[in-house]
Amino acid sequence: MKIVEVKHPLVKHKLGLMREHDISTKRFRELASEVGSLLTYEATADLATEKVTIEGWNGPVEVEQIKGKKITVVPILRAGLGMMEGVLEHVPSARISVVGIYRNEETLEPVPYFQKLVSNIDERMALVVDPMLATGGSMIATIDLLKNAGCTSIKVLVLVAAPEGIAALEKAHPDVELYTASVDKGLNEHGYIIPGLGDAGDKIFGTK
């Protein structure tokens, strides 16, 4: 599995701000979108382009455009919504597929409860977004759904990832690509990433 920890100074700085314990909901939400945007920049760096001729201000001019690669953004509810706008800044014409999966706090197992995928997902590259890759259960379940629907090109974008989650994802889906702002130390006894970000969903939506 291709694993990319984005080490750009802007990514590290913004992620560091997000780790503040008393960060406001507004600021956390803004930064989640901004880091999501920067991760998208990295994840789409290998998109193929083609040369086309357009009418410029002084006559015909040859330019490069992305070569027919359709994209769907797949936020995992609910926290993934906090990164979605940042992704769409770079790919505004992308279609949106939504997957709802929550983690049982006792068993730590993923529980699917909703999915709405674009009809031609087999023709698209999926950018799956979720702030945290902890145990990997929710991400693996989401990718299972996408593959069952025919999607074969999948990239995962997360703010922070635990080594345990990375290992689980690689074992289940070695063909996907992972882009993260940080590989953190690991999980605590409750299955939360350390140092992590706390509960990203609560911080994005202002709930507890």
Swiss-Prot record:
Its EC number is 2.4.2.9. This is Uracil phosphoribosyltransferase. It comes from Klebsiella pneumoniae (strain 342). It is an enzyme of class 2 (transferase). GO terms for molecular function: GTP binding; magnesium ion binding; uracil phosphoribosyltransferase activity. CDD domains: PRTases_typeI. Belongs to the UPRTase family. It comes from the Bacteria. 5-phospho-alpha-D-ribose 1-diphosphate binds at R78, R103, D130, P131, M132, L133, A134, T135, G136, G137, S138, D199. Catalyzes the conversion of uracil and 5-phospho-alpha-D-ribose 1-diphosphate (PRPP) to UMP and diphosphate. Keywords: Allosteric enzyme, Glycosyltransferase, GTP-binding, Magnesium, Nucleotide-binding, Transferase. It catalyses: UMP + diphosphate = 5-phospho-alpha-D-ribose 1-diphosphate + uracil.
